[in-house]
Amino acid sequence: NLAVVAVFFEQGKANPALANLLENVPERDQNVAIRAPFDANALIPSDKDYYRFNGSLTTPPCSEGVRWLVIKDPQSISAEQIAQFEHVMGENNRPVQPLNARMVLTK
């Protein structure tokens, strides 16, 4: 079993918490170590309300058994920061899946 904490981003102001991470993003098919510590907690807003559901991985093999915690409050990201991620990752999202009688709980 696996737990994933997911944060939504919407285009707006640059996100300072992502700035250090993006400075160290490798080119596609290249691995690099992030030199400076990255505080992932800086991406979690003070309002920690979330949605919770059991689902699957978003990348192959798309295995079941994943507990998703999706933060309700979207964080800001600039168009330039989005472009940096897209340059390296391309389009890597999985199509939205049917709910299949899954319960989505909220806190």
Can you say where each PLM-predicted feature lies in the sequence?
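Extracellular or lumenal secretory-pathway regions
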Residues: 1-107
